[in-house]
């Protein structure tokens, strides 16, 4: 009898995902790729027992994601006692729509003969379009309360389990008032239809966002007592002040590295910026790749505003104070224009922790490289001289590190106060160095992108926005950038703040 290993295969290799569109005689493959992981379906080991030569092919119509699953194998394990091959249909059924289990001829015929395909338009409203590398793309936004959106999303739900770590598919059968809180953004490429009846749209990716009610403690408007009729008028979720949270965010593998993620993120940010009821934009449990994308996109958004107001670190916050008068704490308001920065953050609706990351990265970039750790700054001398260093840029760098340490201490105070003072100082020093390394990597990426943009503008006269956005996702997926970001995230826990007592319902999907 063959060993168990002979009957076990890698689930990630066995599953093949294919996007198809009508061809001359049968559906034509547009792209084919494997999942990033399959543990939500096949367990932590991501293996399938009981088959040799197993192929699980998931096909999706490129425009409306009409699904089909086809399973083939060379040999199946015969049950011995309690040991049997994995029941693939039973295992896959919770993750794939029932319509996917039709016969292959029926599916191919449905794709070939779909008379509605040529008139297909993504649901919702066209909110952004752009051209990248000579190809045209569109982003559409629609409410989850729209039945067409729910149908399309239900077909795409399996992507959550295959590409979004710790992701949970959305519950699309909730009451309408709950569904209205959700907006789904679809990214499509406009392609040349291969046949007269084929669609001109091909899916690229999508994102889901939802509104989370935001309690405003200090409302400028004082309520007045009136004799209004009871019951009062109906209040919809869209009328209430809210945080907007990005829940799921996915660009399919064939389209990654081409800037679509940044276009999608900035489109969501623009919608947030233009909605007077949205207070700020946040992200649920972002991974390192998305963190890098978000940082570079927000840096691109905020940097012109920082430059416009000459935001920088004051190297002499104690200029008018004697040594006895100097406070023991970091003089934040004397170092940076806190009121101005608060106004900028509120205007652009960036979450406070994310804004701090972008601000710190900008301030670091304003210090000459030779005065930074990455440029060979004399750290021993800085440790001795501190804010008394002769060079004002050395003083700026000293105060930059102190500002970062102050933020990190506030965020992780409960953990750090349990350490001895020497260990606490060592931990903060280590963490701020890791944070700085992460920022240096992102600054390097952004600087290279800006230089490429300038060259591209000179050659073709292309708009700055388009040229910058094309390169951003490729940059965010750079392995060294991800490594640096990982250091920053796990040395000291530093996440977007959440309201205490938040229900699990609000955190169903994970990015």
Curated annotation (Swiss-Prot):
GO terms for cellular component: chromosome, telomeric region; cytoplasm; nucleus. Pfam families: Hat1_N (PF10394). It comes from the Eukaryota. GO terms for biological process: DNA repair; subtelomeric heterochromatin formation. It catalyses: L-lysyl-[protein] + acetyl-CoA = N(6)-acetyl-L-lysyl-[protein] + CoA + H(+). Residues 455-511 are annotated as: Disordered. It is found in: Cytoplasm; Nucleus. The record marks 182 as: Interaction with histone H4 N-terminus. Catalytic component of the histone acetylase B (HAT-B) complex. Acetylates 'Lys-12' of histone H4 which is required for telomeric silencing. Has intrinsic substrate specificity that modifies lysine in recognition sequence GXGKXG. Involved in DNA double-strand break repair. This is Histone acetyltransferase type B catalytic subunit.
């Amino acid at each position: 009898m063959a060993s168990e290993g002979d009957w076990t295969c890698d689930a990630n290799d066995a599953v093949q995902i294919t996007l198809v569109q009508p061809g001359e005689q049968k559906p034509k493959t547009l792209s084919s790729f494997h999942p990033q992981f399959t543990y939500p379906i096949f367990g932590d080991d991501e293996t399938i027992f009981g088959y040799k030569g197993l192929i699980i092919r998931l096909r999706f119509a490129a425009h409306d994601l009409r699904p089909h699953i086809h399973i083939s194998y060379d040999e199946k394990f015969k049950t011995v006692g309690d040991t049997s091959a994995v029941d693939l249909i039973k295992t896959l059924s919770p993750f794939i729509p029932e319509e996917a289990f039709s016969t292959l001829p029926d599916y191919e015929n449905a794709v070939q003969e779909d008379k509605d395909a040529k008139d297909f338009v993504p649901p919702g409203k066209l909110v952004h379009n752009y051209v990248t590398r000579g190809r045209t793309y569109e982003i559409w936004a629609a409410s989850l309360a729209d039945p067409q959106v729910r149908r399309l999303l239900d077909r795409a739900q399996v992507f959550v389990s295959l590409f979004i770590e710790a992701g949970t598919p959305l519950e699309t059968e909730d009451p309408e008032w709950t569904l209205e809180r959700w907006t789904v953004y679809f990214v499509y490429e406009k392609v040349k239809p291969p046949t007269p009846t084929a669609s001109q749209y091909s899916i690229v990716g999508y994102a889901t966002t939802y509104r989370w009610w935001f309690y405003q403690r200090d409302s400028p408007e004082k309520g007045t007592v009136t004799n209004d009729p009871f019951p009062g008028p109906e209040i919809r979720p869209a009328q209430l002040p809210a945080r907007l949270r990005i829940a799921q965010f996915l660009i399919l593998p064939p389209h990654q590295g081409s800037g679509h993620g940044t276009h999608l993120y900035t489109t969501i940010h623009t919608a947030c910026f233009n909605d007077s009821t949205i207070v700020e934009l946040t992200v649920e449990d972002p991974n390192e790749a998305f963190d890098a994308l978000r940082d570079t996109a927000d840096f691109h958004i905020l940097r012109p505003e920082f430059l416009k107001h000459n935001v920088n670190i004051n190297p002499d916050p104690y200029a008018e104070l004697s040594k006895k008068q100097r406070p023991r704490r970091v003089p934040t308001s004397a170092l940076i224009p806190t009121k101005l920065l608060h106004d900028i953050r509120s205007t652009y609706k960036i979450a406070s922790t994310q804004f701090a990351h972008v601000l710190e990265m900008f301030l670091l970039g304003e210090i000459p490289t030779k005065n930074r750790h990455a440029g060979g700054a004399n750290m021993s001398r800085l440790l001795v001289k501190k804010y008394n260093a002769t060079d004002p840029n050395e003083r700026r760098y000293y105060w930059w590190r102190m500002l970062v340490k102050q933020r990190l201490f506030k965020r992780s105070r409960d953990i750090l106060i349990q350490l001895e003072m020497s260990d606490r100082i060592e931990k903060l020093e280590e963490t701020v160095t890791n944070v700085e390394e992460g920022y240096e990597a992102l600054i390097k990426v952004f600087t290279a992108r800006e230089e490429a943009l300038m060259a591209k503008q000179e050659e073709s006269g292309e708009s700055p926005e388009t040229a910058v956005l094309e390169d951003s996702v490729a940059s965010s997926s750079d392995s060294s950038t991800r490594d640096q970001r990982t250091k920053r995230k796990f040395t000291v826990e530093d996440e977007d703040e959440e309201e205490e007592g938040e229900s699990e319902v609000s955190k169903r999907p994970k990015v």
